[in-house]
């Protein structure tokens, strides 16, 4: 019997091609029946399918559907349109498809496969890919089906549009088995350094960073009829913390590039000075992504085709209601009653997810902000224009305005954390009696102690799985990205009490602000980026804790971003790569360390060993061995509580009651060490690139 896992995975292959053609590197053919044919091939599809099948080495039989699924809403999205979860109409479509596929009885994989084949042939390919990925991730019987790397199936969302004409030529001219020269993606293809924001293009346009954002929202969708798909443990708080860390990391990069911290978008009626020209084409719609000219302004949105009829006044009213909730420390429910406001509830209110306690009162400020920004060029659909990159989860982080918008969103969360209703931590919550950190350091092979080394690397990604209607065989695009030398943390601890467990929390932050002045803790606490968090045993007496940078619970392994590359021999998590689906939303390992500067950027390295009795999550059936540990701090754990009882970002998520600087904040169970991040401004070829 054909392996159903492999068959389900093949539905990701070449998403704009019909299933009557062979799929996968081995040219497998789905044996379509008349009821499963795409609409455009109902007259001659069987004959074409049979013709392709004559040369196929693998044939996949499909169970006929006596009652094919119906998609009255989702089928209204043209197959050549682009899809955005930020648009209310598209949310309705996605909800319909997810409902239908989730409701197919469990362990009826033949029925599921045929239904997915039917849906794939009738729905917009981007809509289907999103819904199909969510379904595979959330059905118990499909969790072992690998979700295809999105950059391989829809490469046009990540790479310069000029690359695809070259890619088709390469696929057409070079027979399979003949080495194919990679297509070089320029480092500066969206702007020049005349535009100061372009200094951050290496970061904003990084494939791994954009994949992170897309995958996180796949694991944490904000809408679905099945509430359990959305209502994961501490989901709203994780929405806050994941985006807060993005802003902190972005500000670190800005300071390293001699720029000020990002300015929040506070006045929603003022012009947006930042322009962005993405230089991307959609292979689905065969159109270029619309640019945004400098100094454009938000306009009231009236686009019935997208389900959008929202005014700036609506947004300002919802904003006032959110700010009132923060200032009062309470959330008002639809029946007029109130309850105390917490960070998890606020996260769901601001986004807003279906978990928002009062959507009518608090609106959907975050999501609509993306839509306002994406349609500044055509707010009323007068010109039949598509949305900009900021309205697509896979491209939104490319746009400089994403960070200005999220700086405002984060500021609202910080006001809650700084309010009188969120108590600063007491000493007893911060200390760990009997535990004293005596020294901390970072060690990088070939570098002095406490120096982290970054450099540029050129890596290849295979475009062929998304290169529809072209010959098979790998077609590589080579692009340049930031990377760093692997390093390790060395932490020496004296435990004067009994043997115990402790949570090690590791952060770094720039030592000085953009004016080269020492930080006040009220500002620096928002600049600390969490590098790792893990639980370790302490024996009585002296302990030395060593931890490899590749073990971080915030990141996914390097080769998970560049999926076709062979496993890194020094990555201790390589055996767990099959468990990528849920934990794959972590931060890319190659972007763990900020760029630094060639002269050496001064940073501070903070380590805290917190009291495990206050950190521990007691959960029935909890096992110390979890199959998927990668990025658990950013992604949580499947079907489990978030693996840390403390507030996300602890101990820097709240202002200090007494300390005015990070030096004042240090207790015996903490340590601070000056480190340097030095950029070696050269490009190294990835030794794991396929030979060409």
From Swiss-Prot:
Organism from which the protein derives: Galleria mellonella
Subcellular location: Secreted
Binding residue positions for Cu cation B: 366, 370, 406
Keyword field: Copper, Disulfide bond, Glycoprotein, Metal-binding, Monooxygenase, Oxidoreductase, Secreted
Role, per record: Copper-containing oxidase that functions in the formation of pigments such as melanins and other polyphenolic compounds. Catalyzes the rate-limiting conversions of tyrosine to DOPA, DOPA to DOPA-quinone and possibly 5,6 dihydroxyindole to indole-5'6 quinone. Binds to the surface of hemocytes and is involved in hemocyte melanization. Binds the A.niger cell wall component alpha-1,3-glucan, a fungal pathogen-associated molecular pattern (PAMP) that activates the host immune response.
The name this protein goes by in its record: Phenoloxidase subunit 2
One Gene Ontology term, aspect cellular component: extracellular region
Annotated glycan sites: 256, 295, 309, 494
InterPro entries: Di-copper_centre_dom_sf, Hemocyanin/hexamerin, Hemocyanin/hexamerin_mid_dom, Hemocyanin_C, Hemocyanin_C_sf, Hemocyanin_N, Hemocyanin_N_sf, Ig_E-set
Superkingdom per UniProt: Eukaryota
Residues excised as propeptide: 1-97
Annotated residues for binding of Cu cation A: 213, 217, 243
Cofactor: Cu(2+)
SUPFAM superfamilies linked: Di-copper centre-containing domain (SSF48056), E set domains (SSF81296), Hemocyanin, N-terminal domain (SSF48050)
Reaction equation(s) it catalyzes: L-tyrosine + O2 = L-dopaquinone + H2O; 2 L-dopa + O2 = 2 L-dopaquinone + 2 H2O
């Amino acid at each position: 019997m054909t392996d159903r896992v492999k068959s389900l995975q093949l539905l990701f292959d070449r998403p704009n091609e019909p299933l009557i053609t062979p799929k996968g590197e081995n040219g497998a053919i789905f044996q379509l029946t008349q009821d499963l044919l795409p609409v455009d091939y109902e007259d001659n599809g069987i004959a074409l399918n049979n013709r392709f099948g004559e040369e196929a080495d693998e044939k996949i039989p499909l169970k006929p559907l006596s009652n094919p699924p119906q998609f009255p809403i989702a089928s209204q999205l043209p197959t050549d349109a682009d899809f955005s979860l930020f648009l209310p109409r598209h949310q309705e479509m996605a909800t319909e498809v997810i409902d239908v596929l989730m409701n197919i009885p469990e362990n009826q994989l033949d029925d599921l496969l045929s239904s997915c084949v039917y849906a794939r042939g009738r729905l917009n390919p981007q809509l289907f890919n999103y819904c199909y990925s969510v379904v595979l991730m959330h059905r118990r019987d499909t969790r072992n089906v690998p979700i295809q790397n999105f950059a391989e199936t829809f490469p046009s969302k990540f790479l310069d549009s000029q690359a695809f004409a070259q890619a088709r030529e390469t696929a057409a001219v070079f027979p399979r088995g003949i080495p194919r020269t990679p297509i070089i993606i320029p480092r500066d293809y969206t702007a020049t350094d005349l535009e100061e924001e372009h200094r951050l293009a290496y970061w904003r346009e990084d494939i791994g960073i954009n994949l992170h954002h897309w995958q996180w929202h796949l694991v944490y969708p904000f809408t679905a009829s099945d509430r359990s798909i959305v209502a994961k443990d501490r989901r709203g708080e994780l929405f806050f913390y994941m985006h807060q860390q993005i802003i902190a990391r972005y500000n670190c990069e800005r300071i390293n590039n001699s720029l000020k911290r990002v300015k929040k978008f506070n006045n929603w009626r003022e012009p947006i000075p930042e322009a962005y020209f993405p230089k991307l084409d959609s292979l689905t719609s065969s159109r270029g992504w619309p640019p945004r000219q400098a100094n454009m302004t938000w306009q009231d949105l009236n686009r019935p085709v997208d389900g959008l009829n929202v005014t700036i006044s609506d947004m300002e009213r919802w904003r006032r209601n959110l700010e009132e909730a923060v200032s009062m420390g309470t959330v008002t429910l639809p029946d007029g009653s109130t309850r105390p406001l917490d960070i998890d509830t606020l996260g769901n209110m601001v986004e807003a997810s279906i978990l928002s306690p009062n959507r009518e009162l608090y609106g959907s400020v975050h999501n609509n902000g993306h839509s306002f920004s994406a349609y500044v060029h055509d707010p009323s659909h007068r010109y039949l224009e598509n949305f900009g990159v900021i309205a697509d989860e896979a491209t939104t982080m490319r746009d400089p305005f994403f960070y200005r918008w999220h700086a405002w969103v984060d500021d609202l969360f910080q006001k809650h954390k700084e309010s009188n209703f969120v108590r600063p931590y007491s000493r007893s919550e911060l200390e760990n009696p009997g535990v004293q950190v005596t020294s901390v350091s970072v060690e990088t092979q070939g570098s002095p102690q406490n120096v982290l080394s970054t450099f540029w690397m050129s890596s290849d990604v295979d475009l062929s799985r998304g290169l529809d209607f072209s010959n098979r065989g790998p077609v590589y695009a080579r692009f340049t990205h930031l990377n760093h030398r692997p390093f390790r943390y060395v932490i020496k601890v004296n435990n004067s009490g009994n043997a115990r467990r402790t949570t090690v929390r590791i952060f770094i932050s720039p030592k000085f602000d953009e004016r080269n002045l020492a930080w006040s803790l009220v500002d620096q606490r928002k600049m600390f980026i969490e590098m790792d968090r893990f639980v370790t045993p302490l024996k009585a007496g002296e302990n030395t804790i060593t931890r490899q940078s590749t073990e971080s619970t915030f990141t996914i392994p390097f080769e998970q971003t560049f999926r076709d590359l062979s496993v890194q021999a020094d990555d201790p998590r390589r055996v767990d790569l099959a468990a990528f689906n849920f934990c794959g939303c972590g931060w890319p390992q190659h972007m763990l360390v900020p760029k630094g500067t060639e002269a050496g950027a001064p940073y501070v390295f903070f380590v805290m060993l917190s009291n495990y009795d206050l950190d521990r999550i007691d959960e029935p059936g909890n096992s110390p061995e979890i199959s998927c540990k990668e990025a658990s701090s950013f992604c949580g754990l499947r079907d489990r509580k978030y693996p840390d009882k403390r507030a996300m970002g602890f101990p820097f998520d709240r202002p200090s009651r007494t300390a005015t600087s990070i030096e004042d904040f240090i207790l015996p169970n903490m340590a601070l060490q000056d480190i340097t991040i030095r950029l070696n401004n050269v490009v190294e070829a990835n030794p794991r690139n396929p030979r060409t």
